[in-house]
Amino acid sequence: MKKSLLTIVLAFSFVLGGAALAPTVSEAHGYVASPGSRAFFGSSAGGNLNTNVGRAQWEPQSIEAPKNTFITGKLASAGVSGFEPLDEQTATRWHKTNITTGPLDITWNLTAQHRTASWDYYITKNGWNPNQPLDIKNFDKIASIDGKQEVPNKVVKQTINIPTDRKGYHVIYAVWGIGDTVNAFYQAIDVNIQ
């Protein structure tokens, strides 16, 4: 009896100790806070301006998939289970941030820092259809910033340039390419260019 009780106590201690060492949701990764991404605006930190966003409600920082995961119709979720609601696409579905052409400051909040290969930014082309699923062929790459394989700060501020020929509703697609893994983090940002 004593041996069984000791086995149970040791097993329980091992489980609790292992759980304490396991990474938590708050420790994983990064999201675009300004201008806010779909995922960020679906979280309490973003004011829940977007609703029915799946896992993004609790973990906007966790849209992580292999680099160059540009799945037609699944750009916003990067095909990650639980984030599929972010892939819904209509002209009115998402909260939009008003911006202007020219320099645009982007702020990433990193809940876990990783060596960085690059920060890449895309924007929808003129004439894209906001009522069709997002497709990388309908985006132009507008910036690539070398991460120099360095570990960034927890708050990363960068400036990109929004082309002067863009007006109205567009989507900016931000990709944080990790330097020491095969993965990247993906964020769709809905903007109204004035």
Curated annotation (Swiss-Prot):
Gene Ontology MF: a single term: copper ion binding
Name its co-factor(s).
Cu(2+)
Top enzyme class: oxidoreductase
Alphabetically ordered keywords of this record: Carbohydrate metabolism, Chitin degradation, Chitin-binding, Copper, Metal-binding, Oxidoreductase, Polysaccharide degradation, Secreted, Signal
User: What does the record give as EC number?
Assistant: 1.14.99.53
Q: How is the cofactor bound?
A: The copper metal center seems to be reduced from a Cu(II) to Cu(I) oxidation state prior to binding of dioxygen for catalysis.
Query: Signal peptide: which range, if any?
Result: 1-28
Subcellular locations according to the entry: Secreted
Q: Give the pathway listed in the UniProt entry for this protein.
A: Glycan degradation; chitin degradation
Q: Name one Pfam family in it.
A: LPMO_10
Annotated positions binding Cu cation:
H29, H114
User: GO:BP terms for this protein?
Assistant: chitin catabolic process; polysaccharide catabolic process
Chitin-binding type-4 domain segment(s): 29-191
Give the superkingdom in one word.
Bacteria
Reaction catalysis annotation: [(1->4)-N-acetyl-beta-D-glucosaminyl]n+m + reduced acceptor + O2 = [(1->4)-N-acetyl-beta-D-glucosaminyl]m-1-(1->4)-2-(acetylamino)-2-deoxy-D-glucono-1,5-lactone + [(1->4)-N-acetyl-beta-D-glucosaminyl]n + acceptor + H2O
Which Gene Ontology CC terms are recorded?
extracellular region
Role of this protein:
Involved in chitin degradation. Catalyzes the oxidative cleavage of glycosidic bonds in both alpha- and beta-chitin via a copper-dependent mechanism, leading to oxidized chitooligosaccharides with a dominance of even-numbered products. Acts synergistically with the chitinase EfChi18A, and combining the two enzymes leads to rapid and complete depolymerization of crystalline chitin, especially with beta-chitin as a substrate. Is likely involved in a chitin degradation pathway that allows E.faecalis V583 to grow on chitin as a carbon source.
- Provide the protein name: Lytic chitin monooxygenase
**Organism field:** Enterococcus faecalis (strain ATCC 700802 / V583)
